[in-house]
C-alpha cells in the first residue's frame, strides 16, 4: 500500500500546496472526511473550515471558505474559493471573512432569494463565526 498521495491546493489567488501527504482532513459540506492514499474516487463540496494536511514533513492547516475536492486513489485536488495558511491567519483576515458572510446573508434576505440561498448564507455566517472561536483569534 502506498504511504503517501499527491495533494494540491489552489485558490483563485495562488497555488498554496503541491506535496506528498499521508492524509488530509477535509471540511466537506456533508460532513468532515479524511482522504488517504488509495481512497475511493469522490467529489465533494467544501464548507468553511480547517483543512489539515498530514505530510512526512509535518502537519499544515489552512482555512478554506468553500470550494471543491476531488479525491482519487492517487491523490487529492482541492479548488478552494479562498484558502489561507493558518500561520498567516490574523484577526483582520477573520473579521473580513465574517463581514463578507454577513453581507451575503443580508443581500440574500433583501433580495427575497430562494429559501435555500438564505439558509446557505446563514450557514456560511455561522461557520465563519464558529471558526473564530475555534482559532482563538
From Swiss-Prot:
The gene is atpC. One of its GO terms (cellular component) is plasma membrane. InterPro entries: ATP_synth_F1_dsu/esu, ATP_synth_F1_dsu/esu_N, ATPsynth_dsu/esu_N. The lineage of its organism: Bacteria, Pseudomonadati, Pseudomonadota, Alphaproteobacteria, Rhodobacterales. Produces ATP from ADP in the presence of a proton gradient across the membrane. This is ATP synthase epsilon chain. F-type ATPases have 2 components, CF(1) - the catalytic core - and CF(0) - the membrane proton channel. CF(1) has five subunits: alpha(3), beta(3), gamma(1), delta(1), epsilon(1). CF(0) has three main subunits: a, b and c. The keyword Cell membrane applies. Keywords: ATP synthesis, Cell inner membrane, Cell membrane, CF(1), Hydrogen ion transport, Ion transport, Membrane, Transport. It comes from Ruegeria sp. (strain TM1040).
